[in-house]
């Protein structure tokens, strides 16, 4: 089959070589963006007098027909034409004749593919931003129900101090807010047009790059043609931001997996987000949370893969850069899917309030309250820490908890202990006293919820 670029070649590659080099199996994902970019390009060619109006109208009509077919999933692509750009050009020529070959005037596939990817990521990042907001709202909705639900807070996966469950959920809301900010800020760099940079050096045609940027909704153009066609920073930044987001989702997934286990029993995931066992009838496995935790690794891999591809490339375009797309497409799919799944899991999970509160009474997470109690009465904190540590050891040896100790045992440890020590040991009291800024006290959590809801526009 004759290549659209085959003039200087005396023989064609074998089919298996074409298949190895072709990107159409995956870059057909860019079909709508490719046609949209071509529509802007040919419009500009007409406005600049580079192509006659009659040719421009024929090309635009043909492209619009192809765009409608693309949206209906009716286009058939061929490996013989390598990539999405040549496939679309061949289809256009087949439809309107040789005039379709004028579309590529003043343009290279190098600036064309870069434009396609900028358009693609701009759409997908905006979708991701909307989904992040959706997950935040789901977390806030659960948090509102559980301001006064208390649970153990953990360090080293050991019970540390009692906290409000809402406080725990809000920690993830703030993590997601940073993700939202990173993706939002990346749009400034994504929303630049490389179209018109040519292969690497610009073009001799009197094109108007600002006009195509305007038609495509870009905020401006790349100011250097070499940079325009060789830049993949915007994809690397997207993969980096996605890795950070997936890391946050993975951490919450890990907690949901633990909390839904028989050992914790803090939450129950809805049946829609769990599966059973092929052999053990009693099993309810948190598969969706586990998959999100697992898929985080593949997103990390895509980031490292593209960094490795780009690290040794001289300017400008190199075929290595074809490897930028599959990881980008897969990351988009993974991130969007993970956010949708997670929102559903959070919205529908059943919180076992009694199990959480019971757990705060069967440990020593109130030990810090004792140390603070003594410090508030004038004992240096390090001495208080020592006193309470010995009391904890005594409890462990006796098989009891701090609230079970009689007052005389406390008095023997320090004369500063009084009857009110038992109020301090109450987990609910302990939580509610921590009203420093950003703390877990109920009043502070409600104040934080109000701030978050105002930011999310859900008041």
From Swiss-Prot:
One of its GO terms (cellular component) is cytosol. GO terms for biological process: arginine biosynthetic process via ornithine; L-arginine biosynthetic process. Its EC number is 4.3.2.1. Its main location: cytoplasm. One of its GO terms (molecular function) is argininosuccinate lyase activity. Pathway: Amino-acid biosynthesis; L-arginine biosynthesis; L-arginine from L-ornithine and carbamoyl phosphate: step 3/3. Belongs to the lyase 1 family. Argininosuccinate lyase subfamily. HAMAP family: Arg_succ_lyase. This is Argininosuccinate lyase. It comes from Geobacillus thermodenitrificans (strain NG80-2).
